[in-house]
Design a protein with these regions (language model features):
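Flexible beta->alpha loop and helix N-cap segments adjacent to enzyme active/binding sites
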Residues: 1-229
């Protein structure tokens, strides 16, 4: 479809939230109002975004991921849409053959067959997946070029749902860069910061509840790293 319709756009939030934002944007253009700023939470929340992580925190987190830790990553404002894109994510290295089963059983508490997505540096995506160009919203399924190398992110049919990360996503981009320095691979397993049947963590309190009630090894909220061991 993309070959025959090169300018095809699939909205990343085809739900009530997206309809509301679309209605606002339509009226904005109709009345020549200023563009909406990208910064900020898309709806009201009762706590502030945490401070940004320091370079040291990002490097320390990359080291934990390289060691095989399961990390909750809570940064900035929240995201809307069906996927976690680096602000409300559970992250893990993409190599561990038991990684998918472990997260499904111990953290997500959901069916064992359900696959996980991945994040990759935008400029490196074609080195690991059959894909060229951006895919920032994790809406496309891509063939994994070396499925045996990345078992926890590779579905039974050899594909993975991927979100590409650009320099605009400063902190998450830096995390992938630091992880690449340690492992040689700018790819992380990325799933939403929640467990089965629960919405993605919208507040710091939600992230802390998930951390203490599951087997997450580490939770990074802003510039603070919480470790259980």
């Amino acid at each position: 479809m993309r070959d025959s319709i090169p300018n095809l756009v699939i909205p990343p939030h085809a739900n009530d939230q997206g309809l509301s934002i679309g209605a606002i944007e339509y009226l904005r253009k109709e009345y020549n109002l200023m563009a909406l700023p990208k910064e900020g939470f898309p709806f009201m929340q009762d706590d502030e975004a945490p401070p940004r992580p320091s370079t040291k925190t990002i490097k320390d987190t990359a080291e934990l991921l390289a060691q095989g830790k399961i990390v909750g990553w809570y940064q900035g404002h929240g995201e809307i849409g069906p996927r976690a894109l680096g602000n409300r994510s559970i992250l893990m290295n993409p190599f561990d053959p038991q990684g998918k089963d472990w997260i499904n059983a111990k953290v997500k508490h959901r069916e064992p067959f359900r696959p996980f997505g991945a994040s990759v540096l935008e400029e490196k995506v074609s080195q690991y997946f059959y894909w060229n160009g951006p895919s920032p919203y994790m809406l496309y399924v891509m063939d994994v070029l070396e499925p045996d190398r990345f078992p926890p992110i590779t579905h039974a049919d050899g594909t993975c749902r991927v979100n590409t990360v650009s320099p605009e996503q400063e902190d998450y981009y830096m995390l992938l860069k630091e992880y690449e320095k340690l492992t040689g691979v700018p790819v992380l397993l990325n799933t939403s910061l929640n467990n089965g049947g629960r919405p993605i963590a919208g507040r710091i309190a939600d992230a802390l509840e998930l951390y203490y009630k599951t087997d997450l090894d580490t939770l990074v909220v802003g510039d603070e790293i919480k470790n259980k061991s």
